[in-house]
Curated annotation (Swiss-Prot):
Any matching Pfam family: ATP-synt_DE_N
Keywords: ATP synthesis, Cell inner membrane, Cell membrane, CF(1), Hydrogen ion transport, Ion transport, Membrane, Transport
Cell inner membrane among keywords: yes
Name of the protein described by the UniProt record: ATP synthase epsilon chain
Superkingdom as given in the UniProt entry: Bacteria
Record PANTHER family: ATP SYNTHASE DELTA/EPSILON CHAIN (PTHR13822), ATP SYNTHASE EPSILON CHAIN, CHLOROPLASTIC (PTHR13822:SF10)
Assembly mode: F-type ATPases have 2 components, CF(1) - the catalytic core - and CF(0) - the membrane proton channel. CF(1) has five subunits: alpha(3), beta(3), gamma(1), delta(1), epsilon(1). CF(0) has three main subunits: a, b and c.
Chief location bin: membrane
Family: Belongs to the ATPase epsilon chain family.
Membrane topology category: Peripheral membrane protein
């Protein structure tokens, strides 16, 4: 099975570093998916969520305010200005990380419809876990 390695890095440190099945990124021209053996490219990323599918088909979510993605055949490196890994072992931890993600995205998004759609998608992915 082909592997895809994903790294998400901010000025504060590494947010994510693991092998994944696929990743959906908020590109500046629209969302796009990346699978193993994807063509090489560099893309600007806008405020939104990164939907990560691991090898067990479980989805994780990372919210970013903006950044760049460098994609090679087997590796995706995301350099983000700010990012929040939406996770938690309890309902309160999950609620806190969701709120931090909302605040991060809201600080960069002037389009209220796009903001609402992004938040709704993020909440749906988290609920589906």
């Amino acid at each position: 099975m082909d592997k895809l390695h994903l790294e998400i890095v901010t000025p504060q440190g590494q947010i994510f570093n693991d092998d994944v099945s696929s990743v959906v990124l908020p590109g500046s021209e629209g969302e796009f998916g990346v699978l193993p053996n994807h063509a090489s490219l560099i893309s600007l990323l806008k405020a939104g969520i990164i939907d990560i599918e691991d090898k067990h088909k479980k989805h994780d979510v990372v919210a970013i305010n903006w950044g760049y993605a460098k994609i090679d055949e087997g590796k995706v490196v995301i350099l983000a200005d700010g990012a929040v890994y939406v996770s938690g072992n309890s309902e309160s931890e999950l609620a806190n990380s969701l709120e931090a993600a909302r605040n991060l995205i809201e600080s960069m998004s002037s389009d209220t419809n796009a903001f609402a759609a992004t938040i709704s998608k993020m909440e749906n992915v988290v609920r589906a876990r």
